[in-house]
């Protein structure tokens, strides 16, 4: 792992000093490092300190996992160890996401989309999808602050036309 340190500064002026390998998990930062634009603190105006801390925690865990995978010496044991490590990481990811309410998850989605952390973006989006899969349209509207612009008559017509989609909902 690289010993270079990169300083990331959140929108609320919180600074985080991280290993270059961790910072490279944020593809936006990786491009800045490659372009020699990371010699000073990198301001991240679209990410608050508490959300950036969560992104860094995730990236640290995944960098450690990448390093652990590359340390395997024999190919035969490497496959078993690698599969075990992937399962451990999936479990860690699931536990990591359980800690957050939907508001935090939505903030994470915005941050990791901006920072281009694809694995965490997929994980956060899947968390939202899992959360809303059994929700009624009204609950989804409430979750995303969507105004219902259908008249009651239009809504009834849509529900009748697509009754199959509403069978398993509350």
Curated annotation (Swiss-Prot):
Which region ranges are annotated with the description Interaction with the F-box domain of F-box proteins?
109-167
Give the principal location in a single coarse category.
nucleus
Q: Where in the cell is it found?
A: Nucleus
- Sorted alphabetically, which InterPro entries does this protein's record hold? SKP1, SKP1-like, SKP1-like_dim_sf, SKP1/BTB/POZ_sf, Skp1_comp_dimer, Skp1_comp_POZ
SUPFAM superfamilies for this protein: POZ domain, Skp1 dimerisation domain-like
Q: Report where it is expressed, by tissue.
A: Mainly detected in the siliques.
Keyword annotations for this protein, in alphabetical order, are:
Nucleus, Ubl conjugation pathway
Metabolic or biological pathway, per its Swiss-Prot or TrEMBL entry: Protein modification; protein ubiquitination
Query: What GO CC terms are in its UniProt record?
Result: nucleus; SCF ubiquitin ligase complex
* Top-rank taxon: Eukaryota
Q: Which GO terms describe its biological process?
A: auxin-activated signaling pathway; jasmonic acid mediated signaling pathway; protein ubiquitination; response to auxin; response to jasmonic acid; ubiquitin-dependent protein catabolic process
Pfam short name (any one): Skp1
Which SMART domains does the annotation name?
A: Skp1 (SM00512)
Subunit and interaction comment: Part of a SCF (SKP1-cullin-F-box) protein ligase complex. Interacts with CPR1/CPR30, At3g61590 and At4g11590.
Q: Give the function comment from the record.
A: Involved in ubiquitination and subsequent proteasomal degradation of target proteins. Together with CUL1, RBX1 and a F-box protein, it forms a SCF E3 ubiquitin ligase complex. The functional specificity of this complex depends on the type of F-box protein. In the SCF complex, it serves as an adapter that links the F-box protein to CUL1.
The family assignment reads:
Belongs to the SKP1 family.
UniProt-recorded name of the protein? SKP1-like protein 16
Q: Which organism is it from?
A: Arabidopsis thaliana (Mouse-ear cress)
Supply the gene name: ASK16
């Amino acid at each position: 792992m690289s010993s270079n340190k990169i300083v990331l500064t959140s929108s609320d002026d919180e600074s985080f000093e991280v290993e270059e390998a961790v910072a490279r998990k944020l593809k936006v930062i990786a491009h800045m490092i490659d372009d020699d634009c990371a010699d000073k603190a990198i301001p991240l105006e679209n990410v608050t300190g508490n959300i950036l801390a969560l992104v860094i925690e995730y990236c640290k865990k995944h960098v450690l996992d990448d390093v652990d995978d590359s340390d395997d010496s024999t190919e035969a044991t490497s496959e078993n160890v690698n599969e075990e490590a992937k399962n451990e990481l999936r479990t860690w990811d699931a536990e990591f996401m359980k800690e957050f309410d939907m508001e935090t998850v939505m903030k994470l989605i915005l941050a990791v989309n901006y920072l281009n952390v694809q694995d965490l973006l997929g994980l956060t989006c899947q968390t939202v999808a899992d959360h809303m899969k059994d929700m009624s349209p009204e609950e989804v509207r409430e979750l995303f602050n969507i105004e219902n612009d259908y008249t009651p008559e239009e809504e009834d017509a849509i529900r009748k036309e697509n009754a199959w989609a509403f069978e398993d909902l509350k």
